Swiss-Prot record:
A Gene Ontology molecular function term of the record: ATP binding
E.C. number: 6.1.1.11
Organism for this UniProt entry: Chromobacterium violaceum (strain ATCC 12472 / DSM 30191 / JCM 1249 / CCUG 213 / NBRC 12614 / NCIMB 9131 / NCTC 9757 / MK)
Pfam families the UniProt entry points to: Seryl_tRNA_N, tRNA-synt_2b
InterPro entries membership: aa-tRNA-synt_IIb (IPR002314), aa-tRNA-synth_II (IPR006195), aa-tRNA-synth_II/BPL/LPL (IPR045864), Ser-tRNA-ligase_type_1 (IPR002317), Ser-tRNA-synth_1_N (IPR015866), SerRS_1_N_sf (IPR042103), SerRS_core (IPR033729), tRNA-bd_arm (IPR010978)
Function statement: Catalyzes the attachment of serine to tRNA(Ser). Is also able to aminoacylate tRNA(Sec) with serine, to form the misacylated tRNA L-seryl-tRNA(Sec), which will be further converted into selenocysteinyl-tRNA(Sec).
CDD domains given in the database record: SerRS_core (cd00770)
Protein name per its UniProtKB record: Serine--tRNA ligase
UniProt pathway: Aminoacyl-tRNA biosynthesis; selenocysteinyl-tRNA(Sec) biosynthesis; L-seryl-tRNA(Sec) from L-serine and tRNA(Sec): step 1/1
Family to which the UniProt record says this protein belongs: Belongs to the class-II aminoacyl-tRNA synthetase family. Type-1 seryl-tRNA synthetase subfamily.
Assembly behavior: Homodimer. The tRNA molecule binds across the dimer.
PROSITE patterns: AA_TRNA_LIGASE_II
Matching NCBIfam families: serS (TIGR00414)
Length: 427
């Protein structure tokens, strides 16, 4: 959520920055609500002062032995008027809060201005794509004989679900274990195991709600539709980041570096017809997430470091990849700046996203009331960052395609062999 004072001080400047990411700020609506808020606030102060002054007259009148019934009636009337003004004020404030919740974050000044993914800027490429001396298969054809079972997934749950069996399932598990071991052992993150079901407050805090309700799986307890709504997590960013909600941290507790391996559940409501073949876009997929809670002055250095941590996984797996900076029009709702890491998929002859690392600055912290006490004892909002480290299923896809052999086998990347106990599967 944006700082409302930015809007009060220079709404046109905010509107211009938001326009860069394709969002039209309704300045007239804000100015109208803000005018009503100020008017009601003044009215409340006026009524409160008048009621206080009138109440004092009661004691004076009683001291003189005068009848106070008229004064009491006036105080009661003023009380009713004040209550009505307070209710009206709360209504306008609620509208302002809801309106603020729907506005995306402001892009950082270093973010390239652009409309969509075509305007993203490549930062670097690492690794050289392998040259094959046989016809390359995609991960579906490579994986099917090895235990990648889409038919059973569809039978059990419908489209965009997959069953992994045998060595494919072991490889999937090994990938996640390697990622967690690297982030906890080499990168300094603390491992967490968090719930897969959360309440709407948590999703409001990290920005998935209210804007992205259609992309969530809503669950009910015992089929009770009147119960407080709960949702399957779309990413463990939600749970990890919300561990600091409604919290005042000590400066010595920062930075907080957290990681978790979890399934992620997404309805993919806006993705009809996209990536219908294979594991690229699933309703359920695993991801190892990195979350950092930082002092504001350190958050952009932390973003670069987090990108490096995601890159280290790809480097260790010896998978070619590139890093891109997302333009203003392609960034996520809560992000001030985002880097995507894209891995090379030889069957598609292109790079595909495997990690997204974002600095949300104080956007989530303001929604969650996540603060720290600075050196002067003043409470300040923290900055929150999140990044995939990495998407496990897409990493499996990349390994199947980049490490495939002519005989149908797949070479196990060197760093995964201790987890697998073998150097290849299939064949």
């Amino acid at each position: 959520m944006l700082d409302i004072n930015l809007l009060r001080n220079d709404i046109e400047a905010v509107a211009a920055r938001l326009a860069g990411r394709g969002y039209t700020l309704d300045t007239a609506a804000f100015n109208q609500l803000e005018s009503e808020r100020k008017s009601l606030q003044s009215r409340m102060q006026e009524l409160q002062a008048k009621r206080n002054a009138t109440s004092k007259q009661i004691g004076i009148a009683k001291g003189k032995g005068e009848d106070v019934s008229a004064i009491l009636a006036e105080v009661a009337t003023l009380g009713d008027e004040l209550k009505a003004a307070e209710q009206a004020f709360d209504g306008v404030q609620g509208q302002l809060d809801a309106w603020l919740m729907s506005i995306p974050n402001l892009p950082h000044e270093s973010v390239p201005v652009g409309k969509d993914e075509n305007d993203n800027v490549e930062v670097r490429r690492v690794g050289v794509p392998r040259q094959f001396d046989f016809e390359v298969k995609d991960h579906v054809d490579v994986g099917a004989p090895l235990g990648l079972d889409f038919d059973t997934g569809a039978k059990l749950s419908g489209a965009r679900f997959t069953v992994l069996k045998g060595d494919i399932a072991r490889l999937h598990r090994a990938i996640a274990q390697f990622m967690l071991n690297t982030h906890t052992g080499s990168h300094g993150y603390q491992e967490h195991y968090t719930p897969y079901i959360v309440n709407d407050t948590a999703l409001l805090g990290t920005g998935q709600l209210p804007k992205f309700a259609d992309d969530m799986f809503k669950v009910t307890r015992g089929g009770d539709e009147s119960a407080v709504p709960q949702y399957l997590i779309s990413t463990s960013e939600v749970t990890l980041t919300n561990t600091v909600a409604d919290t005042i941290l000590q400066e010595s507790e920062l930075p907080k570096k957290m990681t978790a391996h979890s399934p992620c559940f997404r309805s993919e409501a806006g993705s009809y017809g996209r990536d219908t073949r294979g594991m690229i876009r699933q309703h359920q997929f695993d991801k190892v997430e990195m979350v950092r809670v930082e002092k504001p002055e350190h958050s952009y250095a932390a973003l670069e470091e987090m990108v490096g941590h995601a890159e280290n996984i790809l480097k260790a797996l010896e998978l070619p990849y590139r890093v891109i900076t997302l333009c203003t029009g392609d960034m996520g709702f809560g992000s001030a700046k985002t880097y995507d890491l894209e891995v090379w998929l030889p069957a598609q002859n292109t790079y595909r996203e495997i990690s997204s690392c974002s600095n949300c600055e104080a956007f989530q912290a303001r929604r969650m009331k996540a603060r720290y006490k600075d050196e002067n004892g003043k409470n300040q909002l923290v900055h929150t960052l999140n990044g995939s480290g990495l998407a496990v299923g897409r990493t499996l896809v990349a390994i199947l395609e980049n490490y495939q052999n002519a005989d149908g086998s797949v070479t196990v990347p060197t760093v995964l062999r201790p987890f697998m106990g073998k150097d290849r599967i299939g064949g």
